[in-house]
Structure formats: C-alpha cells, structure tokens
Amino acid sequence: MKMLLICAGGMSTSMLVKKLEKYAAAHGIEDFKCEAHGAMDLPEIYKNWDVVLYGPQVSNRAEFFRETVGPDFPLGKIEPTDYAIGNAEKIFALANKLLGK
C-alpha cells in the first residue's frame, strides 16, 4: 500500500509517518510506503499513491482535495483524535476501508 498524508507541512505528520511505518512492520504489512506532503503538492503527486489521507489541520481544504483527485479516488480525513495520538491501527483501517479491503 502506498499512503500519502496531506498536511500543512508540520512536524507532527512526519512523526505519524514513522508510527505508520512501525505499525506496518510489526503487523507484516509488506510493500508499505508512506510520505507526508503539503496540500499544494497534491495535484502533482496524488496519482502515484493508492490512497490519500489528510490531517484535521487541513480539513478546510477537503473540497479542493476532492476536486483535485476526482470522485472515485480513495481520499479520507484522519480523525483529530487518531491524528493527535498517532493511532496507526485506526488510520490503517480507514485506508483499507477506502481501498475496499
């Protein structure tokens, strides 16, 4: 799975990437790739990813994100609590749900 996290460019999303990578390794999730990018990068890079999740700090851009990726692309918002505590299990569950797994 290739998961793109969209944020405002803060350090917290980089920490979340590390938690997701650690969770993937501990649970035998192979071929996992995750990166964090700012919202303005989305139009140029989203097609290279399986799923795009955005943090609560950029949820005001949700309409822009949906318009950018189109109606059928797997796109979702990470819940504020899951984002704040780095709940990798719930974030993976969200990604899998969006991917139809």
Model-derived regions: residue spans:
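Conserved active-site segments centered on acidic
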Residues: 2-40
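A general structural signal for well-ordered alpha-helical segments in protein cores
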Residues: 13, 17, 62, 88-91
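Generic hydrophobic alpha-helical segments
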Residues: 42, 65, 91-95
